[in-house]
From Swiss-Prot:
HAMAP family per record: Ribosomal_bS20
NCBIfam families: S20
Protein name, as recorded: Small ribosomal subunit protein bS20
Gene it is expressed from: rpsT
Organism: Aeromonas hydrophila subsp. hydrophila (strain ATCC 7966 / DSM 30187 / BCRC 13018 / CCUG 14551 / JCM 1027 / KCTC 2358 / NCIMB 9240 / NCTC 8049)
Family in the record: Belongs to the bacterial ribosomal protein bS20 family.
Pfam families recorded: Ribosomal_S20p
GO molecular function annotations of the record: small ribosomal subunit rRNA binding; structural constituent of ribosome
Gene3D superfamilies assigned to the protein according to its UniProt record, in alphabetical order: Ribosomal protein S20
CC terms in the record's Gene Ontology section: cytosol; small ribosomal subunit
Biological classification of the source: Bacteria, Pseudomonadati, Pseudomonadota, Gammaproteobacteria, Aeromonadales
Keyword vocabulary terms for this entry: Ribonucleoprotein, Ribosomal protein, RNA-binding, rRNA-binding
Residue numbers spanned by region Disordered: 1-27
Length: 87
């Protein structure tokens, strides 16, 4: 454990930030799973609706630095391609 006052403060801030990021990451994964489940069920309307909700969340997480912007772009691109491939 830290002995210096500033190090103690940084440790507290780091833990608080870690918990906040964990909840955001969990939320992002949940929305992605909803899109994937809708694609798997074959319901294009539901998949499109779920993707419309998940897309800005992915962008926001990339902007905040929670995930890399290329990872967000990759997820969006692949999900969009899967939805377009549905007949």
């Amino acid at each position: 454990m830290a002995n210096i006052k500033s190090a103690k403060k940084r440790a507290l801030q780091s833990e608080k930030r870690r918990q906040h990021n964990a909840s955001r990451r969990s939320m992002t994964r949940t929305y992605l799973k909803k899109v994937i489940a809708a694609i798997a069920s074959g319901d294009k309307a539901a998949a499109t609706a779920a993707f419309a909700v998940a897309q800005p969340i992915m962008d926001r997480m990339a902007t905040k630095g929670l995930i890399h912007k290329n990872k967000a772009a990759r997820h969006k691109s692949r999900l969009s391609a899967q939805i377009k491939a549905m007949a």
